[in-house]
Amino acid sequence: MISLRVLLVILWLQLSWVWSQRKEVEQDPGPFNVPEGATVAFNCTYSNSASQSFFWYRQDCRKEPKLLMSVYSSGNEDGRFTAQLNRASQYISLLIRDSKLSDSATYLCVVN
């Protein structure tokens, strides 16, 4: 069984990493109230022009985030979900078309 000391060290390392990365990515604040059937856009800007990998995660209530979509070039589309990347403006967005109640979640932008 993992000791409390080990857990605290792991938590400290994770918090230190988050603190060091704090200005790298900015995401539009939420929450958004979107009527069913509408299109919603989540926007994210990043400051490191050397970034190569871009990801959108979906986190349902009280669950771990799950990878929704990865983007390595200008964009990616999967059904009702579209990710668009503009490297010149250091901007990435996630569009959800024909929104459904089941789309209710937290959406997270990750830049690597």
From Swiss-Prot:
Location in or out of the cell: Cell membrane
This protein's name: T cell receptor alpha variable 12-1
Source organism of this protein record: Homo sapiens
Gene coding for it: TRAV12-1
A biological-process GO annotation: adaptive immune response
Domain Ig-like: 23-112
Keyword Cell membrane applies: yes
Lineage: Eukaryota, Metazoa, Chordata, Craniata, Vertebrata
Disulfide bonds: C44-C109
Record's keyword terms, sorted: Adaptive immunity, Cell membrane, Disulfide bond, Glycoprotein, Immunity, Immunoglobulin domain, Membrane, Receptor, Signal, T cell receptor
